[in-house]
Design a protein with these regions (language model features):
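Acidic, negatively charged sequence signal
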Residues: 1-4
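Surface-exposed molecular-recognition determinants
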Residues: 8, 17-173
Length: 173
């Protein structure tokens, strides 16, 4: 329970607002972001959520992207120093050739600070998605969860993280 109620405690608006604000957070990408001919990450300013010290969260996201089969895409989440996570995405593997490809479940990553996933592109104009879910435990300091993306292989085409991509966290303790 985020804010346990104690016998004799006054229940105030501030108490309830804090409980509600910290229980579930969701952010979405407001505009398309573009990377062209670079493998350097660009962090989204929309897909950022503050994480509390000593808290644990379930994590889920859905990232829509558009890229070529040459460039593919890599997406990462960066966590506060000392945070640990178990997150695994469902996505298309690299080397795909059409939108009807087998689903690729990547291995669960027991990672601290940064999680990175690579997913395949088909052709410019073909939207694809990557769907990570998992657990985040902030054992150290508070900080932000931030989503970034880049081309996996530099290519002179646009790789887009599409508007409507989203992340959501539910605090469990």
């Amino acid at each position: 329970m985020l804010n346990p109620v104690l016998a004799g405690q006054n229940l105030t608006a501030d108490f309830f607002n804090t409980s509600i604000d910290n229980a579930r957070s969701m952010k979405y990408q407001k505009t398309d972001l573009t990377r062209n001919n670079t493998t350097t990450y660009l962090d989204s300013t929309d897909l950022v959520i503050a994480l509390a010290a000593g808290a644990a969260y379930t994590f889920e996201g859905l990232f829509f992207y558009d890229t070529s089969a040459t460039a593919d895409i890599k997406i990462r989440i960066t966590l506060p120093t000392g945070a640990v996570s178990l997150i695994s995405p469902w996505s298309s593997g690299t080397g795909i050739s059409a939108t009807a490809n087998p689903l690729n479940q990547q291995a669960v990553a027991d990672v601290s600070d940064v999680n990175e996933w690579i997913a395949g592109g088909v052709a410019i104009g073909t939207l694809m998605s990557i769907r990570p879910v998992g657990w985040i435990n902030v054992t150290g300091s508070a900080g932000n969860l931030t989503v970034g993306f880049a081309q996996n292989t530099a290519s002179a085409v646009n790789t887009l993280l599409k508007q409507g991509s989203w992340i959501a966290l539910t605090r469990v303790f």
